[in-house]
């Protein structure tokens, strides 16, 4: 996500709001990040949207950040009128906007995509190569598109990867996996990527189905470790799971600290009011 363009727009908006305030006017209408000056914005902690808001504050923008562990809490805030907008990933916004047009509206979308990848511990390059091949296989055989259509209503993965030859899976690269289990770290409060069904007992979502497909191809049982997103990377560092499949945005900082796959889905930041 190219935050500099957004930040420049916000700073310009802050100056405009200042001029308006001096003339006696005031507005809380949010149409873009340029309107964040003086606004209350709900966001999930440790996400790129949260990072972007914090950067705005550091640059002097007077935006009140309302951070929550789960994105569901952000939309609860918005529905109850406790915030002016939610700053969130487009894949999540689409879930809340479907059939809820009377409650929520998407008013702005970032121009540039924000790719998401699977995250592994630094140095686990063999497993990284295997996971890349497996994702390619899901694109090659059309399964990735099926999973996307199931959870988003359309194939939002179209064009993310182009695979014209059937990949080869080298299962000898599973040497770091123990006890025949593929352990996945994720945060089950991010629909439609990963969340629980109405009973609260079963994990469902795009990333959940993706993990199960990987387990099937690898001949492994899949086990999920549900944790908060702001602590998910610490769990990977401690070896609590083999990888993170949790709508992880690919950033230079994460690529330096971890092994990140190429994108398996692309995303954008949006503002929902």
Q: What is the meaning of each model-derived region?
A:
Residues 17-21:
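C-terminal motif of bacterial Sec signal peptides marking the signal peptidase cleavage site
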Residues 23, 47, 117-159, 208-217:
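Extended ligand-binding regions for polar small-molecule ligands
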Residues 25-35, 100-112, 122, 208, ...:
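Acidic, polar ligand-binding/catalytic clefts
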Residues 26-71, 90-94, 125, 186-191, ...:
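Bilobed "Venus flytrap"/periplasmic-binding protein-like clamshell domains
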Residues 48-63, 106, 135-175:
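Ligand-binding clefts/hinges and TM-proximal coupling segments of bilobed small-molecule sensing domains
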Residues 73-77, 83, 92-93, 210-211, ...:
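Short, hydrophobic alpha-helical packing/hinge segments within bilobed ligand-binding/sensory domains
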